[in-house]
Amino acid sequence: MAHKKGASSSSNGRDSEAKRLGVKRFGGQQVNAGEILVRQRGTKFHPGENVGRGGDDTLFALKAGAVEFITKRNRRLVNIVENETVDA
């Protein structure tokens, strides 16, 4: 085995790209059906009312409405509160 590194070899110089995870729509924001609410690894946030969960644990809106974050039984839930339409 060589006891000295060869010319210009290095064990450094590698890094993975950032995955752009996190909350994408915050509490009180209006969203449409299908909009991504949270990108995550694992279920840091759990789906609540009108929220679906993708195969990579991404949470998305199933219906249009306002985003709401609540804590229930030590779980952080994301709900979509549908907008009530007022008949005039």
Curated annotation (Swiss-Prot):
Cellular component, GO annotation: cytosolic large ribosomal subunit
Chain spans, region Disordered: 1-25
GO function terms (MF aspect): structural constituent of ribosome
Pfam family, one: Ribosomal_L27
Biological processes per GO annotation: translation
Keywords for this protein: Ribonucleoprotein, Ribosomal protein
SUPFAM superfamilies attached to this UniProt entry: Ribosomal L27 protein-like
Coiled-coil regions, chain positions: none
PROSITE patterns the record matches: RIBOSOMAL_L27 (PS00831)
InterPro entries (UniProt xref): Ribosomal_bL27, Ribosomal_bL27_CS
UniProt family annotation: Belongs to the bacterial ribosomal protein bL27 family.
NCBIfam families recorded: L27
Protein name in UniProt: Large ribosomal subunit protein bL27
Organism: Corynebacterium diphtheriae (strain ATCC 700971 / NCTC 13129 / Biotype gravis)
